[in-house]
Amino acid sequence: MTDALYALEKLADAADALETGTGSVRERLFEAFTDLVRIGPEDMPDGELRLAFAELMGALTSEEAKGTEGRLVATLMIVDEEQAQNIARAIVDLYHALGRLLR
């Protein structure tokens, strides 16, 4: 349960960065990633949520790194606005789903 509560905290921080942060959606996704990278699928107490988290992280790091930029930056450089919004929505949805499960 402790891992799940920590995951909920990090997802809350990521959702907050998306909802109240400044900058473009891509910039806010970058900030949200700094919280998400601290947790892993194993921190999710439910198989469906583990899969959703793994897919989310895969969507954020789908592009190969070029030079020193890293996979996240490479991915954020090629996603369009709609894709970025969908990823952001998935983060917020995962936060709410985990919160409901832990109630």
Region locations from a protein language model:
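Amphipathic alpha-helical binding modules
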Residues: 70-103
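Amphipathic alpha-helical interaction modules
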Residues: 19-65
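Charged, low-complexity surface segments at secondary-structure and domain boundaries
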Residues: 11-16, 37-38, 72-80
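Short terminal alpha-helical segments
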Residues: 1-33, 88-95
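Amphipathic alpha-helical coiled-coil segments with heptad-repeat character
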Residues: 1-4, 8, 46, 77, ...
